[in-house]
Amino acid sequence: MNNFKYLLVGLAIFNFISCQNKPSLQSEYVEGNALGTSYHINFYSEKSENWEQGFDSIFEVVNKSMSTYLPNSDISKINKGNKDVKVDQMFREVFNLSKEIYANTDGYFDPTVGNLVNAYGFGAEELNELTEKDLDSLVSLVGFKDFYLTEENHIQKPNKNSYLEFNAIAKGYTVDRLAVYLESQGVENYL
């Protein structure tokens, strides 16, 4: 009989604990434009807040660092020949990851093809009429192996006309930063 009392008390405690109010998750949906495209983010959160402000701050920092479409971004300054630009942590991470991918693909992934991309009208500049000589000249500027990150966090490039762009990797990197932000806010499920 004593065991039965303990069982009833245990079940009552379990029932009380399991029926307590848990914070309810709210479905959140945020959409907008950034990095030259649109984005849509679905997630569940216990708190309702101005999520756009947090997302926009991430987009702003990424753009300031790596957008070839913004003339005052760090990468645009580097592409114009400014050797004094001290790159931030995000730029360094993307640069080093690009070096790794460049090596693992035997150079097929190369973030220095920007001059060619622009010449064909796919980048930040307008399409130009190209001769074979022009193409040869542009191809000679391609080669990520000759770019270096110095200990002082400056980019050393082989030719003042070499052009660096992370468009093939920056959007994915930004998604990773958004995920870190959401998780830091207690969000576990997001898309």
State where each predicted segment sits:
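Bacterial N-terminal signal peptides
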Residues: L8-N15
